[in-house]
Amino acid sequence: MDNYVGKRLDGRYEIQEIVGVGGMSVVYKAYDNVDDRIVAVKILKDEFLTNDDFVRRFKNESKAIALLSHPNIVKVYDVSFGEKLQYIVMEYVDGITLKEYNQKQGAITWNDALFFKPKY
């Protein structure tokens, strides 16, 4: 796995730490020195850069997220689809994943599930 911690992307995004690893990408916490904010940068793994199917999926993911607008969905701020590096810059949300929550608290109860449901 490529590690971008300590590197700067496009002279703007200072990669600070890994926050998640998936099958085709790695998500990093980064500092955006242009907009002065913390962001999440999702980078397509190098091994998939030459696979047209994975590149297409990655691009489609960024388009789908960018089209959605809801308080519970992160915003897409920027994308880069270069030949050697492809990434999506998104709103960073600090906290734990549902998987981590379940590991710490056990199975989620009905009361907890109702707490997390949208309140319309």
Protein language model features and the residues they cover:
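Protein kinase glycine-rich loop
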Residues: I15-G22, V27
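Flexible N-lobe loop architecture of eukaryotic-like protein kinase catalytic domains
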Residues: G20, N60, S69-N72, L85, ...
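Activation-segment/catalytic-loop signature of the eukaryotic protein kinase fold
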Residues: V79
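Conserved short submotifs of the Hanks-type protein kinase catalytic core
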Residues: E83-T97, Y101
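Activation segment signature within eukaryotic-like protein kinase domains
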Residues: F116-K117
